[in-house]
């Protein structure tokens, strides 16, 4: 998939960069695999905002995606590549030989008409799902299960993949996209290859309105608010924060505070922690 740029006909097209969607072949989703989904708009069951800057946007239908790949030994043909408004990755529509249809995350390099299969005896080819014990060392995988039978939970976004580093006993060491090296049970399933549509990371919305179409509302800096609205607010002119470091709207430390529990039981499965990003690379802003 290529990147498309625009001439500066308007201020919104000056910096607009989008993907050309040449890989997408289906115009409408499979009716049997879509359901209506109530949009929470960042609210919980009491109507209280728990996630700010959410709301509005275009209407969506949720595509039911098969993250388990549990139809073992039944071959399927790739019928189409569809767009999914709920994620950056595209979806591949599979037609199984027993008549069932399912969506999966479209791996990079997949082709229409290609045959895919899942199971411990599946060939080592892109798009096939196998247990980690049957995948060779050094292979790139995605949609990795954290617990057997629960479905893929890791390496699912566009362009992401994990690498099989080592095998020892009942566990397999995986290098995750965050550079963390973690042990996973050998019976957990993963899909060979990396997730497609990797060029989406090079896109630029170009204008604020396109972000509103995606259901994202404006982010207002705390330093320009009143003191009753944010701990950073108040003062005359462009006043400093007045604290030792930035905090959230609720007074908790922000931008760099570790949030993982020290005594979390799964810490023993983490062989190497992820590389911490700096504030500059993280794109930190005055929350």
UniProtKB/Swiss-Prot annotation:
Family matches, as SMART domains: Ribosomal_L2, Ribosomal_L2_C
A GO cellular component annotation in the UniProt record: large ribosomal subunit
GO terms of molecular function: rRNA binding; structural constituent of ribosome; transferase activity
UniProt keyword annotations, A-Z: Ribonucleoprotein, Ribosomal protein, RNA-binding, rRNA-binding
Family: Belongs to the universal ribosomal protein uL2 family.
Function: One of the primary rRNA binding proteins. Required for association of the 30S and 50S subunits to form the 70S ribosome, for tRNA binding and peptide bond formation. It has been suggested to have peptidyltransferase activity; this is somewhat controversial. Makes several contacts with the 16S rRNA in the 70S ribosome.
Protein name: Large ribosomal subunit protein uL2
Gene giving rise to this polypeptide: rplB
